[in-house]
């Protein structure tokens, strides 16, 4: 059955095209520094926002009109698979991602839930045989059901911990079955509302035990996906333990998990943590922990996770700069963890949104590559820190000095002069590259 009859395959037509169902800047076969755009960007569709989201919010019912929503239960799950692979083919997108409950309804028992999963996974596997679209990552939803009201791996209830572990065990098996390149842990309920009734030490210790057991089981079944943690500071809990990349990295180091995990970084989560997207990417990169990206953007005037499709090309440029400096994302990719706005409720809007996001990152890729080729930012940074390449600065960096020697040096100094940071020049230069790359 076809769900998008009126829409053909999305093709690259160039910046002058007026066709809303065409890429203006994303040309998957265009070579950029020895790799195609498709290889650089590794785009993925988020199954939950694209095929299960009804666009409801706390103030109103869902508005989404989806041709597959005439079905229910397992029939709906199967219809979504059909729609998904038609969507993937028409968008020519290389990857997709899902939670367990996105693809199959939760049953009345764990056994029934697993049986539902087995049925849909078998169907997805058949579709993948004839599709170029692969599984970027999968995960399990350990946050929506009321059993997870107090957390999953960080729950105060050992039975919930066991149930969460059983779900992840099944998730790892599903990932192996479908050839997932990564496996994601997002701890939506792994945090607390108040310290007044929380044993933080026990919860953190248990969370680490959970991660170690997950990796042990992945090794047992020979599932070689990259494990990823997705930081978020809050929502739904008041304070989540994986607040941002820095706190997540400290957790991984403290529990000897830093060689097991990397980070799946979401732009909107960076905003909620009070960081720029590029800050989180940069911090992960310089610690060799940048694994994958949830490509979206938040609304700067709102304090919650709006999950908008990315359209800010200044941000996508700086993001792609960090990814290029990282020599790419390895097994990771750019998953559009984004949903159309509540007023964009037609099935056609799903295509428009993904086209906009893919074009925005294609622009970012080309501008970032030009910035790197011309060493625009590298030259700025090297010049700014040049005092550490000579004299006392070189001794500091090489560890050949101490406070005694530094005091002697300081006593010889007259007035210290500082050069201008010239931030306005740098920002204007980036604007120049943004405006001239496609001129």
UniProtKB/Swiss-Prot annotation:
Coiled coil ranges (UniProt) are: none
Active site per the UniProt annotation: 99, 102
Q: Which cofactor does it need?
A: Mg(2+)
List the catalytic activities from the record.
alpha-D-xylose = alpha-D-xylulofuranose
Q: Which UniProt keywords apply?
A: Carbohydrate metabolism, Cytoplasm, Isomerase, Magnesium, Metal-binding, Xylose metabolism
Q: Which SUPFAM superfamilies match?
A: Xylose isomerase-like (SSF51658)
- Textual note on the cofactor: Binds 2 magnesium ions per subunit.
Q: In which compartments does the protein localize?
A: Cytoplasm
Molecular-function GO terms, alphabetical = magnesium ion binding; xylose isomerase activity
Binding positions (Mg(2+) 2): 266, 269, 305, 307
Q: Does the keyword Signal apply?
A: no
Quote the cellular component terms of the Gene Ontology held in the record: cytoplasm
Its transmembrane ranges are none
Domain of life (superkingdom): Bacteria
Positions of Mg(2+) 1 binding: 230, 266, 294, 337
The principal localisation class reads cytoplasm
GO-annotated biological processes: D-xylose metabolic process
Subunit structure and binding partners: Homotetramer.
- Report the HAMAP family cross-referenced here: Xylose_isom_A
Q: Which family does it belong to?
A: Belongs to the xylose isomerase family.
Q: What is this protein called?
A: Xylose isomerase
């Amino acid at each position: 059955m076809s769900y998008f009859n009126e829409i053909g395959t999305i093709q690259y037509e160039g910046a002058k095209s007026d066709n809303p169902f065409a890429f203006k800047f994303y040309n998957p076969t265009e070579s950029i520094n020895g790799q195609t755009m498709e290889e650089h960007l590794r785009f993925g569709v988020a199954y939950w926002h694209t095929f299960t989201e009804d666009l409801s919010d706390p103030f109103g019912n869902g508005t989404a009109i989806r041709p597959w929503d005439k079905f229910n239960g397992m029939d709906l799950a199967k219809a979504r698979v059909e729609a998904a692979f038609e969507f993937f083919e028409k968008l020519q997108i290389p990857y997709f991602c899902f939670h367990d409950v996105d693809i199959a309804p939760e049953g009345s028992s764990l056994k029934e839930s697993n049986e539902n999963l087995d049925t849909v996974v078998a169907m997805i596997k058949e579709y993948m045989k004839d599709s170029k679209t692969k599984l970027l990552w999968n995960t399990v939803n350990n946050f929506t059901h009321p059993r997870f009201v107090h957390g999953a791996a960080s729950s105060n209830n050992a039975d919930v911990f066991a149930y969460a572990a059983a779900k992840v065990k099944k998730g790892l098996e599903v990932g192996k079955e479908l050839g997932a390149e990564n496996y994601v842990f997002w701890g939506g309920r792994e945090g607390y509302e108040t310290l007044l009734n929380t044993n933080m030490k026990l919860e953190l210790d248990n969370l680490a035990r959970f991660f170690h057991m997950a990796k042990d089981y992945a090794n047992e079944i020979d599932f070689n996906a990259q494990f990823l943690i997705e930081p978020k500071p809050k929502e739904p809990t008041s304070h989540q333990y994986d607040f941002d990349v820095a706190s997540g990295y400290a957790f991984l180091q403290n529990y000897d998990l830093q060689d097991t995990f990397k980070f799946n970084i979401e732009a909107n989560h960076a905003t909620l943590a009070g960081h720029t997207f590029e800050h989180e990417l940069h911090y992960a990169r310089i610690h060799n922990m940048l694994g994958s990206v949830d490509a979206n953007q938040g609304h700067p005037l709102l304090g919650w996770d709006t999950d908008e499709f990315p359209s800010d090309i200044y941000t996508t440029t700086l993001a792609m700069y960090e990814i290029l400096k990282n020599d790419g994302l390895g097994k990771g990719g750019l998953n559009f963890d984004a949903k159309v706005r509540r007023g964009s409720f037609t099935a056609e809007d799903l295509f428009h949104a993904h086209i906009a996001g893919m074009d925005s990152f294609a622009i970012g890729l080309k501008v970032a590559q030009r910035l790197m080729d011309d060493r625009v930012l590298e030259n700025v940074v090297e010049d700014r820190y040049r005092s550490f390449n000579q004299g006392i600065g070189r001794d500091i960096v090489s560890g050949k000095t101490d406070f005694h020697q530094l005091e002697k040096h300081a006593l010889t100094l007259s007035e210290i002069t500082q050069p201008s940071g010239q931030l306005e020049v740098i920002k204007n230069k980036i604007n120049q590259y943004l405006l001239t790359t496609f001129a």
